[in-house]
C-alpha cells in the first residue's frame, strides 16, 4: 500500500491506495478540487458541507445519466 497526500478545498488529506495508483488518486483529487472551486465561484458564500453536498448531487446526477446511456 502507498500513501498519497492530496489537497482538496485547501485542506491536505493523506490517503492510502494500491501501489502504482498514486497518480490516478492524485488526478481524482485534483478533479474534485477543481469542481469544488467551480461550485464555490458560482455559489458565492457557502459552507464546506454545502459544497460537498452540491458536488455529491452533481456527481450522482452524472452517474445516473451515464448509466442511462449504457
What are these regions (language model features)?
Residues 5-6, 12-13, 42-54:
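Amphipathic, hydrophobic secondary-structure cores in small proteins
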Residues 52-62:
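An amphipathic alpha-helical micro-motif enriched in hydrophobic residues
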Residues 1-29:
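Basic helix-turn-helix/winged-helix DNA-binding cores
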Amino acid at each position: 500500500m502507498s500513501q498519497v497526500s492530496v489537497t482538496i478545498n485547501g485542506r491536505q488529506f493523506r490517503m492510502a491506495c494500491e501501489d502504482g495508483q498514486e497518480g490516478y488518486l492524485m488526478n481524482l483529487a485534483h478533479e474534485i478540487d477543481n469542481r469544488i472551486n467551480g461550485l464555490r465561484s458560482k455559489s458565492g458564500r457557502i459552507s464546506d458541507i454545502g459544497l460537498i453536498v452540491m458536488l455529491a448531487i452533481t456527481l450522482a446526477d452524472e452517474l445516473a445519466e451515464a448509466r442511462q446511456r449504457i
